[in-house]
Amino acid sequence: MKIIIKTEKFWRYYFIVRILYLFFAIFVYAKLTTLGDTERYLTAPLSVISTSMLFNSTIMMDSIGSILGLLGGSNVITNLPATLLSYYTIKWAIDKFEFRKNVNNYLLFVILSLPNFCVWTGVFSKEMVGLVFSAILGTLFIDFLDGKYKIEKKHWFAMYLCMIFKPQYFPFILQGLVMVYLMNRYIKSVDWKMFLGCFVIFCNLACLYLISDIVNQYADIMYMYFDDPNAKSTRANPWTEENDFFYEAPAGMFIAFFGPTINEMMNSPTHMLAGIESIVILVLFLSLGFRLIIRCINSYKINVTIFFSYFVIITGIALLHYPFGIFNPGSAIRYRTNFFFLYILMFLYIKKYYKQFYLNKDKIIAKI
């Protein structure tokens, strides 16, 4: 009974936080900067509705937004469905795997209540949709890790949304799912699992090499989309020479995920707040992955299936986020929201997996 009361209290407080963030986004944040394309979606004319919305993310958002916008454009009422959808999606995913029983609830509450995450997923935006499909695909990935391979209608729908809104993420999520399926179901030898994992990584690197000329051409034109004279936070183009995209990738992937650099944090209060939030994220992720790190250091052992599937998904998505986040810290933080909850679920699973691993190990030792 205590657990039920505690659970209700946790989600009641979190619901209040999400509602407060909605009011903050509409009445404060929107006055300081723009809420992406939210206002445009919610003021679109009904004439934009067409069958093209099934294949184009922008037209889909315009079409749905034009209907919601009948209630007065962008306001608390028209953005409330986004807040509710985000809240119940997060609650469903966390409760599905009972993560609250294995993770410090205060830590979990903090990571789910981070400002930029709550603001961008609490208004009618593509980031809100990104949260939904990343949550559903994240739960499918964890189900695969647990040996449950049933793909339901909601998973197919999430794949569809991912292909419409962020098609570049899907190949790496699919690779992770296939690797887990093969390693868990058919490959029992650790050596062969290592071979498969290394082979998948090699194939990805080979593909990058084969399309390097196309990537270089893309890098040459990418900067112009961010080189807006009104964009005060746009950085200098780091890709001035051939293959700079690849040379700068290791540091660039981290910067694109983190957001503002130290110098930018020192020169802007808003960047300082965003930087502090990113520091909190890194600390929380390290905390969630602490047992995995300790196990690697102490025994040089690791779950090969988790390692390679996580590596492909996390680094693959980070690489694709890199060109969208390297030029502007604001864009980096906003676009990060699309896959942030997927990362949260993955790190929560690590925490749960190794907590249960050590608990079972202690029980065996106690019996001996």
Q: Where is each model-derived feature located?
A:
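Membrane-interface helix-loop-helix junctions at transmembrane boundaries of multi-pass membrane enzymes
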Residues: 99-103, 147-152, 190-191, 266, ...
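Alpha-helical transmembrane segments and terminal signal-anchor/GPI-anchor hydrophobic tails
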Residues: 28-40, 163-299
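Transmembrane-helix motifs of polytopic, lipid-linked glycan transferases
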Residues: 80-100, 283-290
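Short hydrophobic/aromatic helix or loop-helix immediately within or flanking a transmembrane segment
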Residues: 37-73, 251, 256
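Transmembrane-helix signature of polytopic, membrane-embedded enzymes
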Residues: 93-115
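Short acidic/glycine- and proline-prone juxtamembrane loop motifs at membrane-interface regions
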Residues: 122-129
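Specific aromatic-rich, kink-prone transmembrane helix
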Residues: 130-146, 342-346
